[in-house]
Amino acid sequence: MSTKRNMKNENFVTFEVAKLLQDKGYREDCCASYITDETGRSELTVVFGVRKFRHLSIYTRFQYEYLAPTLYAAQKWVRTKGKIHIVVELNKHGWYYRLYDTEELSLISQMDGYTDTFEKALNDGIKESLTYL
C-alpha cells in the first residue's frame, strides 16, 4: 500500500497557505492540489502521481488550482528559499511556533497564543514566514 493513500488533510498546508505559497513562487512538484470551482469553493485533491505547476488549471471545470505541498515540503522550501527555519514547540498551554533566521541565527518572530495540534502550529508558522519572503 502506498504511503500517499494514508495521507490525511492535516498533512498538507491549508488552502489559504497554498495560495500564498504559489504567490511567493512555490513551484515544486506535489502529490496534491486545491481546486476551486466558479463559486470559490475549494477542495483538496490528492493524486497518486505528481502535480506540476505547469499542468495546473488545464481542466475547464475548475476556476483555479493551487499546489498543495505537505507541511514538511513547505517548511523545507521556506527554509531553503527564505533562510527561515520554523520550529514547533509544545508546553503546558499547547503548540506554538518560532521563526529563526538561519544566517544570523536570530529569532524573527514567534506565535501569539497556542494551538491544539502540531500541524496547526506548523501551518501557522509557514503562513507567518511567507510575510518575510
Q: Each PLM stretch: what is its role?
A:
Residues M1-N6, I58-F62:
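Charged, low-complexity surface segments at secondary-structure and domain boundaries
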Residues T3-E43:
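Extreme N-terminal leader/activation tails
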Residues R5-E10, T36, L90, Y100, ...:
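Intrinsic-disorder/low-complexity regions
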Residues K19, R27, R41-D116:
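N-terminal segment of the canonical double-stranded RNA-binding domain
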Residues K24, T80-I84, E128, Y132:
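Surface-exposed polar/charged interaction patches
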Residues S33, R41, L105, K120, ...:
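A generic signature of intrinsically disordered, low-complexity regions enriched in glycine/proline
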Residues M111-L133:
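Ampiphathic alpha-helical segments that act as solvent-exposed interaction surfaces
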